[in-house]
Amino acid sequence: MLSIKDFTSNLTRHARNTEEKRNMVLTILNSTATKREVRNYLKKYPLLKDVDIYSKGQMDRSSVSKRNKYSSMIDNLMLKHSTNNENNKIEDFHLNRPRSDLISKSKLEIKLTDTLRIAIVKIRQFRDIDPTALKGIAFTLYKLIKLGVSPIVLLDTDKEVQALNGESDAMVQKSIANYHQQALSFINIIEKCFHKYEDDNELSARAIRGLFEQKFDEDRFSMTLPELLLIPISQGIVPVVYPVGYMDKGSKNVFLSSEAVLQCLATDLKSLNDRHRLDHDKENLFTIEKYIFIDPLGGIPSLERYKSAHVYINLLQEYEDIVSELYIGFLKTGERDQHLKNLNLLQKLLQVTTDASGIVTTPQIAMLNQTDRFTNPIIYNVLTDRPTISSSLPVDLKKTPLLNTSIIRRGVPVEVYVDESSDKSGLCLDSLLKRGALDLEKLKNVIDLSFRKDLNMKKYLARVKNNVAAILIAGDYEGVIIVTWEVTDEEKPQKIAYLDKFAVSPKAQGSTGVADVLFKSLLSNFENELFWRSRSNNPVNKWYFERSKGSLTVTGTNWKCFYTGKNYPSLDRMKGYFNICERIQPSWNG
């Protein structure tokens, strides 16, 4: 029978949870720029679970906490798979496991109502992070769980791995034991943040040991017991993965590099989910959505951004250029090597889980509360799948902030064909068609979908023939840009670059970053001068305005003219822009 005290306590809990739900919904609405982003988020992530005390007409009066329930379950699981009880003492990190091939073929003993959306969080130099920052990171982890994300934490031990190279086994075991104590201290700190709350609002974490093993006939470590991870995350508990692996050869435990651990997690979890999809009509058991690197150095630095971080990195297009830039010499060797390590590791991980995103930020930024004044880039990226600012915003504008967070995706390749002739005679479209570099059907399709109109291709090609300055194609025509040479009516006519078509397919609009990737590439190829026109009532004009040096209304028309580039146009030049905007005839059917 419920007492008055129980009832009052649960009313308080109900009010707090109701307020938390309200605040979470407001966070989503305030952080997402479009209805599409809200829909995409809610479609992917299960929002706060119903914790109403009136659900099912009764209250859960279990005196066993969620963590204790989990501890019992996991201990039983470990015992079940152990064949030698002597190796299961708490001081020993090795668990005798069943054969990997049998485990991989067995059915996972977990049934979920929602797909788990996993974020793997790597924290570098966690011992040097002050307790206040750790508490802030704990609240970010808590917020992620409430937003439907399942974090897995790895405390980076790469320094230990390097320092122990060539040391005795006894020294390695001593270091592993020391790491164990530090990991428990980390768990204790983040859990203490929530001791003032009831059980349903606590943040629980669990040390996960004995997860990795290298067999005699294998050249890499593998995850032999996925339940060790999936049971806690399915209950909203944060697994803290030990970077320790057992080697059959030599029967010993060794420290693993963060790269080895993360690649093992990414590869083995993906393989497990792929097998699940085969047996369950392509339904996902879980997906890896984010790789979050919390690093004192922050995001990957950019010279263009005055050594602040790249906002967004499209690996398939930018990786080699960024690596080359990091070797120019504007960074200390140690810093450069760490940034390269982060970039290279994320490139490898995103080759395995191609739809995931990487986030590299600092502990101070990772602990930010999501408020009207501050934007936590981790929370914001979960809600929108975008960086906090657009990567195509001009760097030199005062309103464009310099950040220390990089969002990294495998992205899309960008094919760029630019007229490099001295007389600006234009690209030879026939040559591009014969080489298979240009597909007119796909080109027309993406333009039609983007503009919601029917392009008269014959009429359009007749107008731009011998005048095409550039064609940029993102991926498999997820987006295209066509730039033409247009002649001014000045006393000495000149050909200038005019952005004629900028189209992004509806599926690629928003969080994919295709528009930003294309526009950045466009500006890098036409950095001196570029202009374009847009209908005065075009909702995209705000986006254009933020990326242009200026805009003017073309008198007597419904056109707005935008311009950008290093060369500031004279009054006569602007008149030339206006004349071109007025005389170009649309090439639409109907």
Curated annotation (Swiss-Prot):
It is an enzyme of class 2 (transferase). N-acetylglutamate synthase involved in arginine biosynthesis. Residues 427-587 form the N-acetyltransferase domain. The gene is ARG2. Disulfide bonds: none annotated. Gene3D superfamilies: 3.40.630.30. Belongs to the acetyltransferase family. One of its GO terms (biological process) is ornithine biosynthetic process. Pathway: Amino-acid biosynthesis; L-arginine biosynthesis; N(2)-acetyl-L-ornithine from L-glutamate: step 1/4. The keyword Acyltransferase applies. PROSITE patterns: GNAT_NAGS (PS51731). GO terms for molecular function: L-glutamate N-acetyltransferase activity. It is found in: Mitochondrion. This is Amino-acid acetyltransferase, mitochondrial. Its EC number is 2.3.1.1. InterPro entries: GlcNAc_Synth_fun (IPR011190), Vertebrate-like_GNAT_dom (IPR006855). Pfam families: NAT. The keyword Amino-acid biosynthesis applies. One of its GO terms (cellular component) is mitochondrial matrix. Keywords: Acyltransferase, Amino-acid biosynthesis, Mitochondrion, Transferase, Transit peptide. It catalyses: L-glutamate + acetyl-CoA = N-acetyl-L-glutamate + CoA + H(+). It comes from Komagataella pastoris (Yeast).
